[in-house]
Amino acid sequence: DKMKSKKSKLAQTIYGKEVIKRVVNSVKKAGIEEVGVVVGENKEEIESILKDEVKYIYQEQCLGTGHAIMQAIPYLEEKSGRVLILNGNIPLITEQTIQKIVDKSIKEDEVATILTGIISEPKGYGRVIRKENKIYEVIEETDLEEVQKGILEVNAGVYCFKINELLEILGKLQKSSMGLYYITDVIKMMNTKGLKTGGVLVE
C-alpha cells in the first residue's frame, strides 16, 4: 500500500487503468492523432505508462498550467489549425465530450472553447465568470473574491484553441499573484482583444 501512495495522481489506477492512460485513450478515440504530454518530475513514471504512444514535452520547473503550455511553443509553431489542451488528471473525460468541444470550436469559429460544469460544491475549482451570459474569464480558486466563491460553474480543464491566436497570447501571459502562469488567463486576454470564445457545458 505504501508503494501506491508514492504514485503521482496521473499514475493512480481507476478500474485497472492509469488516469493518464485513460485521458490519452479518450483523446485518441476522439480522432486526435498526434498527442503530446507535458511532463516534469514525474517524467519517468509517465513514460513507463505511455511508452511511445505520445510525444513528450519537458517542463523543468512547475510554474503553472500556462507555463506547461509555453514549453510546447516550439512544437505548436510547426502546426496550424487547432490544439486541444487537457489536464492529465481527468479520467472520466469521454471521447464524445472531446468531440463536442472540438466540433463547437470549428462550427462556431471560436478562438477558444472551454469545457465547464455546474457542481454544488465548487471549492477547489477555478470559477467561470460570465458577462451577458458569455464566458468572459476563468478565475483560479486562490484569486477569487469572496463574492465569486458562490459561483457554481467551474472550469473542467479541457480547452480547444486556434493555434495562431494562442501563440500570440502566450507571449504576453503574466505571472499570477502566486508566481504561476495560468492557461485560464488566456481566456480573458482573448476576450479583451474581442476574439470569439465560448464553452461547452458538460452534463
Regions found by a protein language model. Give the residues of each.
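Conserved N-terminal catalytic core of the sugar/cofactor nucleotidyltransferase
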Residues: 17-88, 92-103
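Conserved donor-nucleotide/metal-binding helix-loop-beta segment in metal-dependent transferases, i.e.
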Residues: 96-123
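Glycine-rich N-terminal loop/short-helix segment of MobA-like nucleotidyltransferase
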Residues: 1-14, 30, 49
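Catalytic-core segments of class I nucleotidyltransferases/pyrophosphorylases
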Residues: 136-203
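Short aromatic/basic micro-patch
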Residues: 13, 92, 160
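Short, high-confidence coil segments that cap the C-terminus of an alpha-helix
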Residues: 32, 80, 107-112, 195
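Rossmann-like NAD(P)H-binding beta-loop-alpha module
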Residues: 117-147
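A residue-level structural signature of the nucleotidyltransferase/glycosyltransferase Rossmann-like core
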Residues: 90, 127, 158-159
